[in-house]
Amino acid sequence: MFKTTREKGASFEQQARLFLEQQGLRFIAANQHFKCGELDLIMADGDTYVFVEVRQRKTILFGSAVESVDWRKQQKWLDAANMWLAQRNLSLEDADCRFDLIAFGRTASDIEWLPNFLD
């Protein structure tokens, strides 16, 4: 079993990465940290940057994994993506990008992929 929440999160992020690679996306980076927030996974779908948030909930007592992505989390996600793009002299306005959510239930096999979650 997992010793820490961080180890559990890393395991689900790895499962999400493998799932997305099986769907044809290419891995770019993981766990990119900025003052404004973190990017769990950055993938590429052709020429499109895909910023992936990975969420997991073992119970829906406090809401599902999808419901846990509130307005504040969405803003942090956008801000972190803009920071990552800025490091490459790009921005959300001029880069081809999208924001996908990978939501897990209790297990890694209980996976839901929501492309264009912030559309």
UniProtKB/Swiss-Prot annotation:
One of its GO terms (molecular function) is nucleic acid binding. Transmembrane segments: none annotated. Gene3D superfamilies: 3.40.1350.10. It comes from the Bacteria. Pfam families: UPF0102 (PF02021). InterPro entries: Restrct_endonuc-II-like, tRNA_endonuc-like_dom_sf, UPF0102_YraN-like. Belongs to the UPF0102 family. PANTHER family: UPF0102 PROTEIN YRAN. This is UPF0102 protein Asuc_1462. It comes from Actinobacillus succinogenes (strain ATCC 55618 / DSM 22257 / CCUG 43843 / 130Z).
